[in-house]
Curated annotation (Swiss-Prot):
Any one biological process term the GO annotation gives: regulation of DNA-templated transcription
UniProt entry tagged with the keyword Transmembrane helix: no
The name this protein goes by in its record: Uncharacterized protein y4kO
Family matches, as InterPro entries: CopG (IPR002145), Non-func_TypeII_TA_Antitoxin (IPR052991), Ribbon_hlx_hlx (IPR010985)
Domain of life: Bacteria
Keywords assigned by UniProt, alphabetized: Plasmid
Segments passing through the bilayer: none
Organism of provenance: Sinorhizobium fredii (strain NBRC 101917 / NGR234)
SUPFAM superfamilies found in the cross-reference section: Ribbon-helix-helix
Keyword Iron tagged: no
Length: 82
C-alpha cells in the first residue's frame, strides 16, 4: 500500500531532483520516495541508537577513563601521522 501527499521544496531542490531522475531514468516521484524512505530509515536507526545509549546510561554503563584514553590516543596518533 502507498500513500500520496504533497511536499513543498525549493525550486533549486526540485531542479536537482529532476536532473537526478533524468540521469537515472526514474521519475521525480520515485526519486522523492526513495529519498524519504532513506531519511526515515536513518532517523529510525539514529533514534534507536540514542535510546539504547540512554538506557545504558540509566544503568550506569559508561566507558571507563582508560577506555576513553585508548580511543583518544588512537585518533591523536592517527592525526599526527597524516
Amino acid at each position: 500500500m502507498t500513500a500520496a501527499f504533497t511536499v513543498r521544496v525549493k525550486d533549486e531542490t526540485a531542479s536537482k531532483l529532476d536532473q537526478l531522475a533524468e540521469k537515472l531514468d526514474r521519475s521525480r516521484s520515485y526519486m522523492a520516495a526513495e529519498a524519504i524512505e532513506a531519511f526515515v530509515e536513518q532517523q529510525e536507526w539514529q533514534l534507536a541508537e540514542i535510546e539504547a545509549g540512554l538506557t545504558e546510561a540509566d544503568r550506569g554503563e559508561f566507558a571507563s577513563d582508560e577506555d576513553v584514553a585508548k580511543v583518544v590516543r588512537k585518533y591523536v596518533k592517527s592525526a599526527r601521522q597524516s
